[in-house]
């Protein structure tokens, strides 16, 4: 299926999730809102959705058929990763570019949530100070500005 909205730099696709499982990855983190493409979530026509009906309308207007034809499942990447005990961490943010392409100790401290399967975490990378790429500018977050 050709999906003009597919961009592997912006979201994880089903083949990518399977690749993580096949390569025995234990956890994967993302600096984005969700592991799955937004049209695989309840923002579109899945689960209790759509909570953003305009994205379904815009997709159909642009491609001539409902988004659900191309994105039929609800959060398939979540399902693949969770079913195989691969931890997925979304919304990492921060200065990730300063520590990419190197090994470091990563810890995620979750809220205690009895019987929960997901929660926010305090994500921490322990990196020796001499290995931080100081040529990368600090990330700034202008909260409240759109």
Put a short name on every predicted segment.
Residues 1-146:
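Active-/binding-site microenvironments in catalytic and ligand-binding cores
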